[in-house]
């Protein structure tokens, strides 16, 4: 697979799970002989939701909630067939969303 790159985008709400997953991917790729660029942290997406505290009155009394989506990008340069097989067999944490582009 010469001249080809694999780009892996990881998303998670918890940054600790995300970091452990990126470390697993990097160690697996390096063990099989591929060159890894990253992990590159992307900007955290913060979604804020504002709701009324009471169900009926008191419009001025509100509460805010937020969801933070943390993202990382990894580039695997010139992956070997063993690298692709190892990445397919890799079992990551449940809260991590993985997008792979060849």
Curated annotation (Swiss-Prot):
GO terms for molecular function: structural constituent of ribosome; tRNA binding. One of its GO terms (biological process) is translation. The keyword Ribosomal protein applies. The keyword Ribonucleoprotein applies. Keywords: Ribonucleoprotein, Ribosomal protein. Belongs to the universal ribosomal protein uS10 family. Involved in the binding of tRNA to the ribosomes. Part of the 30S ribosomal subunit. This is Small ribosomal subunit protein uS10. It comes from Methylocella silvestris (strain DSM 15510 / CIP 108128 / LMG 27833 / NCIMB 13906 / BL2).
């Amino acid at each position: 697979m010469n001249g080809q790159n694999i780009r892996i985008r990881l998303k998670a709400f918890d940054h600790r799970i995300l970091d452990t997953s990126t470390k697993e991917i990097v160690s697996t790729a390096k063990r099989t002989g591929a060159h890894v660029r990253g992990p590159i942290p992307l900007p955290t997406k913060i979604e804020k939701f504002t709701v009324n505290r009471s169900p009926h009155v008191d419009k001025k009394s509100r509460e805010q909630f937020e969801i933070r989506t943390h993202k990382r990008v990894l580039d695997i340069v010139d992956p070997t067939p063993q690298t692709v097989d190892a990445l397919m067999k890799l079992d990551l944490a449940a809260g991590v969303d993985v997008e792979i582009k060849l």
